[in-house]
Amino acid sequence: MSKNIEHTMQFDLNKTKEALTKAILTEVYDSLQQKGYNPINQLVGYLISGDPTYITNYNGARALVRKLERDEILEEVIKSYLEIK
């Protein structure tokens, strides 16, 4: 944190949301892989259908992914794919 109190700090909610989405997807991906599933196929199934049973309960992955809205996940994935900030 800056010691200069003359300047106003800015909080970037978009970067926070992006970091949270990445952290959750990484954790879910790892959990799916550890259980022997194809993580990409399972995540695509979940994103298309909204059915959380595509995601394993292992390591709390299902509960984690449900903390995010599917449209927000897709938004972050597309921005990352197209390298749009």
UniProtKB/Swiss-Prot annotation:
Pfam families: IreB (PF06135). It comes from the Bacteria. InterPro entries: IreB. HAMAP family: UPF0297. Belongs to the UPF0297 family. This is UPF0297 protein CLL_A1175. The lineage of its organism: Bacteria, Bacillati, Bacillota, Clostridia, Eubacteriales.
